[in-house]
Regions:
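C-terminal regulatory/oligomerization modules of transcriptional regulators
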Residues: 1-10, 132-164
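N-terminal leader segment of winged-helix/HTH proteins
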Residues: 1-38, 162-164
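Charged, amphipathic alpha-helical coiled-coil/dimerization segments
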Residues: 3-4, 79-140
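Active-site phosphate/pyrophosphate-handling residues
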Residues: 14, 46, 136
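Short, locally clustered residues in the helix-turn-helix/winged-helix DNA-binding domain
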Residues: 20, 49-55, 115, 143
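Alpha-helical linker/hinge and terminal dimerization helices associated
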Residues: 22, 26, 30, 67, ...
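N-terminal helix-turn-helix DNA-binding core of bacterial DNA-binding proteins
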Residues: 24, 28-72, 84, 154-159
Length: 164
């Protein structure tokens, strides 16, 4: 027996549509600014942010978990980035099947070049439009939505570099 579908009402449709539109606008702005400030795509930037903030090489499985990506997507992305000289993959000495990935000098140069403009974009198109109360409320609401997922992330979300 199939469960009865609870269709979206007008308010819910509008809310979902707004969420999708905002997500699209944010990604488009980030992609556009990455193209002008660096030679990185948004996925490359996300990978490099995570790797550049790690204390050494990162297991491929841990990278997939941190990015909330399928392992095959991470593998393909790392392969492309290896060909571009942005990262390097090494075998895990304890486990012949496992692999580590780390940034190269070129990858670090690209992330350092892209990070300032990326942070300015995140502020301009998202954070600066909210006051402190808005940010706290949005963080509360997003945590409420995120709590419904099986989140295996063990680190902070990638995509926004921290100033070290």
């Amino acid at each position: 027996m199939t469960e009865q579908v609870k269709w979206l009402n007008e308010q819910e449709k509008a809310l979902w549509g707004s969420f999708l539109a905002i997500e699209g606008h944010l990604h488009l702005a980030i992609q556009r600014d990455l193209k002008t400030s660096s030679n990185l795509t948004e996925p490359e930037f996300e990978v490099l942010v995570h790797l550049s903030e790690a204390d050494g090489p990162v297991r491929m499985t841990a990278l997939a978990d941190a990015l909330q990506w399928e392992r095959s997507r991470v593998s393909h992305q790392v392969t492309r980035m290896t060909k571009r000289g942005l990262v390097q993959r090494t075998s895990c000495p304890e486990d012949g099947r496992g692999a580590f990935v780390s940034t190269t000098a070129e990858g670090m140069r690209e992330i350092e070049k892209a990070a300032p403009d990326h942070v300015r974009t995140v502020r301009r198109v998202f954070l600066d439009r909210l006051d402190d109360d808005d940010k706290r409320e949005l963080a509360r609401l997003l945590a409420k939505v995120e709590s419904g997922f099986d989140v295996t992330r063990t680190s902070a979300p990638s995509g926004v570099p921290s100033k070290s």
